[in-house]
Amino acid sequence: MSVELLPHSTEPHANGADKSVSAAARVTQSLKKQQVFDAEQVKLQSATDELKSAQMFAPQTPITAIDDVVDEALAAHPQALDVESIRPKLHQSRRWSWLARLSLMALLLLTLVQTVLGLRDAWLESPWLFSFYGAVLGIVGSWAIVGVIGEYRKLKRLKQVADTQETGARLALSMQMGEADGFIDNIVRHYPDSQGLQRLRHSLKDEHNDAEKVLLFEDLVLTERDELAKKIVRRYAAESAVLLAASPLAVLDMAIILWRNQRMLRDVAACYGIELGYWSRIKLIRSIVINIIYAGTSELVTDLGTQLLSVEMTGKLSARLAQGLGGGLLTARLGYQAMALCRPIRFKDEQRPKLTKVHQELLMELKQFAGNLLTKDGRDALKTQLEGTEVNTSSKEKSLS
């Protein structure tokens, strides 16, 4: 019995072992399959997330880049024009240039020959006449030489502003030390002593790099110069607006604008240490006109929109007041362009003066001017002033008699 029971007792154990081995194999295979499936699922899930992120952000990326490029182009366009407009034109025709040089040399040679022949004839006729002619020619020649040298220096000083602006833009990004001192000294020697210069001298330290020194110079000195130039521009713009509103003739309007703008450009340039001569003034006016014509799109739309809206609203009240407002805004625009061309460091976008603040002051000036002319109180005040002037004049005449 025991012999027969042994096989029956070992067979269940063998079957149980086989079952446990097969179960373990199935569990292992299932685990491997589960691991492989999990890895593939993770890869698929990551790829799906990348596709979703690409779908979400890919369409917006080129739009943002295009907007940045457009903004940078609009911001950089007027500055590039400001620099290039001051520089002498190098693309002029050589044929006209050589003809101009030959013509000038021929005229100078002809003048010299005629002068020598005239002096020789005067010497043969009378030594006293020769002395008189020689003295007159010496005085006129000395005056002409001094004037030419002065005009050349003033024109050269104006043309150097473009190079100074390029150097300032480069030093504003420089982490080196030593070059900014000479750059600042070369500029401030043309400026009068002021509180900004004193604060700059106390603020500059040896451990400051070039970018920090240029930033201090712009914040302490140039900001002070900018405020003074803005006051000059606003004053001349207000005077031009009132004079144009009171002027009855178009020819007189043109003379007033030309006269006031010439004085304004001279005073604005003097704020930045630039003395204008005849040719340098013509060069500056030419550069201003070029910058106004080829101004950036955003700046042009803002300024013209402000000007046209203000002139249209004022024109409904009075055509003469609208004419004065337009002339005042034109004067202010010329003054602001002169500031940009004469400033040794280029304006930043947030620092560039706008016409939106000037037209409010012009409207207030014209409103006060119109009120003095149209209201009864204004007429009574004017009548009182005239009567007082007549009384003072008559009393002076009686005292003299």
UniProtKB/Swiss-Prot annotation:
Which protein are we looking at?
UPF0283 membrane protein SO_1811
The keyword Ribosomal protein appears for this protein: no
Record family assignment:
Belongs to the UPF0283 family.
Q: Which Pfam families match?
A: DUF697
Please give the PANTHER family that the UniProt record associates with this protein.
UPF0283 MEMBRANE PROTEIN YCJF
GO-annotated cellular components? plasma membrane
Record has Cell membrane as a keyword: yes
Q: Main subcellular localization, coarse class?
A: membrane
| Record's keyword terms, sorted | Cell inner membrane, Cell membrane, Membrane, Transmembrane, Transmembrane helix
Give the source species.
Answer: Shewanella oneidensis (strain ATCC 700550 / JCM 31522 / CIP 106686 / LMG 19005 / NCIMB 14063 / MR-1)
Protein's membrane topology: Multi-pass membrane protein
* NCBIfam families in the cross-refs: hyp_HI0043
Q: Where are the transmembrane segments?
A: 99-119, 129-149, 239-259
Give the location in the cell: Cell inner membrane
Region feature Disordered, mapped onto this chain: 1-22
